[in-house]
């Protein structure tokens, strides 16, 4: 599809109608959803009349070039005010009195854009596991259509972290410096590493292993919550560091309030030693209630015995060494600690996540990440792709990031000619790009003052709309749950 300075206005969809089939839209306030007529995906699949969600702040100037495109991370939404709120506001990095700020929701996300929750017109049901593979480049091309419909002539700066950084890199590589003037990429990579691909696979396998997954054809109200929760816990560990968790949690027990946040199930007091052991063993198991499990211990034990063949009898002389018994009174048992604050935190995060995300969407977006490679279908040598990026670029890395390592940021800065590299010294790992607000704000403001001088020096426009949250407020969509608030 060709692009013009002013493309045909896109049809705006009624969000209330879409909410009937996608209740997760209730979590995003103030966004708009438009219908894109057509897009041919990289795979060759043709999309017709599909939705893209976005949210804006500020006003487009007369030249239609004061545009900041903010790209969200893996499970984020178009609501920048929620997950990067401390950067949004007058005289901040994302200043709506100077810039027209827009964040477009990536395809595969459950928050408004084309996703497994979208209704397939041909079947009248959700796409579910039949949702087509959408790449980072597909996102950029779909988002460009929306920008054209809004009259955007060029982008002053594209900014994103993690998956959002992948989109930022593709924006610059796909459209050049005539359209994209500057770039800021945080905690990202030129191509998705084997390490990251492996973590994505482990998280998908968590979902697949849930018996409620049903090949992806599960009812939305009965999605595989145990698998999705486990996937989220696994992901969170990659966003932090060993020292971050040790400093906060150590081996402490969770408080009553923390246990309530984690929705730790109340279990009945065990009446036998076996029930006591079973409750410890299955603590955290989400597929059955602990009380019910304890009540069937004898039955389960009997079923194991009854399936043993006579030749392997538990009473035979050859197997006597493997036979034992457990005795004692429950009141006399004093077990070692088995429930820790770190576990409580992970369970809380898992429970919080399943109430705001969809399992098929999680699978779709992690596969999107796996496709990311700036050199794919361009040239074999990725350094040549990076060397062709002409835009002034700010690369921000995190010294303790174990997912998108600092060496990967150094690689970007080494081969992108007009780039500067900044390091965030933080013990918080990958999530620091969503936590170190003051430093990130300072770095971006300084970069924009240098490279978007005309816009930054222009008289600010009056902007009385909503702005971001301060850093003490809890984010709904952010990758980071401020661990210090736990």
Curated annotation (Swiss-Prot):
Enzyme active site: 162, 401, 430
HAMAP family membership: MetX_acyltransf
Role: Commits homoserine to the methionine biosynthesis pathway by catalyzing its O-acetylation.
Catalytic activity from the UniProt record: L-homoserine + acetyl-CoA = O-acetyl-L-homoserine + CoA
Cross-referenced InterPro entries: AB_hydrolase_1 (IPR000073), AB_hydrolase_fold (IPR029058), HAT_MetX-like (IPR008220)
GO biological process, one term: homoserine metabolic process
Superkingdom: Eukaryota
Stretches the record annotates as Disordered: 248-274
Pathway as given in its UniProt record: Amino-acid biosynthesis; L-methionine biosynthesis via de novo pathway; O-acetyl-L-homoserine from L-homoserine: step 1/1
Class of the enzyme per the UniProt entry, highest EC level: transferase
Keywords, ordered alphabetically: Acyltransferase, Amino-acid biosynthesis, Methionine biosynthesis, Transferase
EC code: 2.3.1.31
Domain AB hydrolase-1: residue ranges: 66-436
Bias type Polar residues, positions: 250-262
A single GO molecular function term of this UniProt record: homoserine O-acetyltransferase activity
UniProt family annotation: Belongs to the AB hydrolase superfamily. MetX family.
Protein name (record): Homoserine O-acetyltransferase
């Amino acid at each position: 599809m060709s692009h013009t300075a002013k493309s045909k206005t896109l049809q705006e969809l009624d969000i209330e109608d879409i909410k009937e089939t996608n209740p997760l839209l209730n979590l995003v306030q103030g966004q708009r959803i438009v219908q894109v007529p057509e897009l041919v995906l990289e795979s060759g699949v043709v999309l017709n009349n599909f939705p893209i969600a976005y949210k804006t702040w500020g006003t487009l100037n007369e030249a239609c070039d004061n545009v900041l495109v903010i790209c969200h991370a893996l499970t984020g939404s178009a609501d920048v005010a929620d997950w990067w709120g401390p950067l949004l506001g007058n005289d901040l990095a994302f200043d709506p009195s100077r810039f027209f700020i827009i964040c477009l929701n990536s395809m595969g996300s459950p928050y408004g854009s084309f996703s497994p929750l979208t209704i397939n017109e041909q079947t009248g049901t959700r796409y579910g596991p039949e949702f087509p593979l959408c790449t980072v480049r597909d996102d950029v091309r779909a988002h460009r259509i929306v920008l054209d419909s809004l009259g955007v002539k060029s982008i002053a700066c594209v900014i994103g972290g993690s998956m959002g950084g992948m989109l930022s890199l593709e924006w610059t590589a796909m459209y050049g410096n005539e359209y994209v003037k500057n770039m800021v990429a945080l905690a990202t990579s030129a191509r998705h590493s084997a390490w990251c691909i492996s973590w994505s696979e482990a998280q998908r396998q968590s979902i697949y292993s849930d018996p409620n997954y049903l090949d992806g054809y599960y009812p939305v109200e009965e999605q595989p919550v145990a698998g999705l929760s486990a996937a989220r816990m696994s992901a969170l560990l990659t966003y932090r560091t060993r020292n971050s968790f040790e400093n906060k949690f150590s081996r402490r027990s969770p408080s009553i309030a923390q246990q309530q946040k984690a929705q730790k199930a109340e279990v009945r007091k065990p009446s036998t030693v076996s029930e006591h052991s079973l409750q410890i063993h299955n603590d955290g198991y989400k597929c059955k209630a602990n009380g019910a499990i304890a009540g069937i211990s004898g039955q389960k034990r009997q079923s194991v015995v009854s399936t043993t063949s006579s030749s392997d009898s538990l009473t035979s002389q050859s197997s006597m060494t493997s036979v034992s018994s457990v005795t004692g009174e429950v009141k006399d048992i004093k077990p070692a600690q088995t429930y820790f604050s770190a576990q409580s935190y992970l369970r809380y995060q898992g429970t919080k996540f399943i109430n705001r995300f969809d399992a098929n969407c999680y699978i779709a977006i992690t596969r999107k990440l796996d496709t990311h490679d700036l050199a794919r279908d361009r040239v074999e040598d990725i350094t040549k792709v990076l060397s062709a990026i002409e835009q002034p670029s700010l690369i921000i890395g995190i010294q303790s990031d174990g997912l998108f390592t600092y060496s990967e940021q150094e690689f970007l800065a080494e081969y992108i000619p007009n780039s500067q590299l900044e390091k965030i010294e933080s013990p918080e790992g990958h999530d620091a790009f969503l936590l170190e607000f003051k430093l990130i704000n300072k770095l971006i403001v300084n970069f924009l003052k240098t490279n978007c001088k005309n816009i930054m020096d222009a008289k600010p426009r009056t902007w009385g709309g909503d702005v971001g949250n301060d850093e003490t407020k809890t984010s709904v969509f952010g990758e980071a749950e401020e661990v210090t608030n736990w």
